[in-house]
């Protein structure tokens, strides 16, 4: 019979990541050990950005855009707040506060001198800070970090032990990978602490030197701070 010949040519070239990818979030699933890393994230799309790369537990590949100008949306962390109870077993709740600034108020009054965990959530990975006074200087001038520090995450919390018979306003700002939200109006966490006698014994939070630490040779005692 008739014989036909076809010639195919192949060239090896560097991988070109797709211009726009919806697969950035698959990075951890594709990584051999489940930990996303920079080169793998970048290979999934030109719009893919690795965040929290210094911490393998929180490393994440997100779909970014230089045209993203939307600030993180801040909401109460409902499960965290409502999962706590006062010393009488009453569950805490919150009411949304509208206006400027908007936020939430915690009910009932918080127990004094007992740790309370405050929290907010964001609709995208972000980092958050708070102040006890309203300032207009922006995110990076705020004093207090949440427990997550500079990590870009969606769940944010911090724990405080506060004196009784006080009213508090905490002003929160959060920024995303592109610093959106830096100068936005803050989110308000409003609450009061119970007016009650202080019957709580002191709690030792830390010591220096730490328990079990080594001391210099031939030293039998050392000051404890």
Give the label of every model feature segment.
Residues 130-132:
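Conserved aromatic beta-strand anchor motif in extracellular beta-sandwich/beta-rich domains
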Residues 1-127, 138-163, 169-180, 185-187, ...:
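Extracellular/cell-surface secretome signature
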């Amino acid at each position: 019979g008739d014989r036909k010949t076809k010639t195919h040519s192949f060239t090896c070239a560097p991988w070109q990541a797709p211009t726009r990818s919806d697969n950035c979030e698959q990075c951890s699933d594709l990584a051999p050990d489940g930990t996303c890393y920079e080169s793998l994230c970048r290979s999934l799309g030109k719009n893919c950005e690795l965040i929290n790369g210094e911490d393998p537990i929180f490393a994440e590949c997100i779909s970014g855009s230089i045209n993203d100008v939307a600030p993180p949306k801040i909401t109460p962390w409902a499960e965290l707040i409502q999962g706590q109870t006062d010393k009488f077993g009453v569950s805490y709740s919150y009411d949304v506060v509208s206006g400027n600034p908007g936020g939430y108020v915690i009910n009932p009054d918080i127990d004094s001198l007992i740790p309370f965990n405050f929290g907010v959530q964001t609709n995208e990975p972000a980092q958050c800070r708070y102040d006890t006074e309203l300032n207009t200087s922006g995110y990076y001038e705020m004093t207090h970090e949440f427990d997550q520090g500079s990590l870009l995450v969606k769940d944010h919390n911090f724990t405080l032990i506060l004196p009784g018979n006080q009213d508090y306003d905490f002003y929160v700002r959060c920024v995303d990978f592109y610093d959106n939200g830096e100068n936005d109006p803050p989110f308000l966490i409003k609450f009061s602490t119970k007016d009650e006698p202080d019957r709580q014994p002191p709690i030792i939070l830390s010591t220096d030197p730490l328990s079990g630490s080594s001391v210099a040779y031939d030293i039998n005692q050392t000051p404890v701070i």
